């Protein structure tokens, strides 16, 4: 069994809505696997072909982006060469397999202020940039009732020591770049075709406060 599969709850019953946040401990916040070369190539292609859909940043996000670059090089990883007008978060995002998002504390709420997002699971960065976190998670079932206050509290309490969580989805499409949510829902897959027409998609998320004031 794939190692990460042991880390997610696959209870067939209706699971409780929860964040599932854990301490990262000695684990690295960045991972590398045998898909690194192909995924970095896909990121570069998406950045060229879908530029405004995979990277956006609000003004005054450069300092936080530079800190992310420092966090990456602090692990021994190398960044792609710098160039004129290259936002530091875009540079960081093109250097690692992970997508990278910056949240800023603004007027009592956390706002999505910048993101290098090449592998979205059915959401568009252009529709979420500049919006508070509860709006970003708007389509998530049970979020307003069960998670909104907990997520805001977690964000406020985050330290520079990272925590992590897992997400998982079942989609009829293995593509990493999936910005569209099916308007009429997913097609019904016959049981005999489930093994080759449905795909388990997982996300490993780490969260931390930056030293740059008011940023995560």
Short names for language-model regions:
Residues 1-216:
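Extended, well-ordered protein cores
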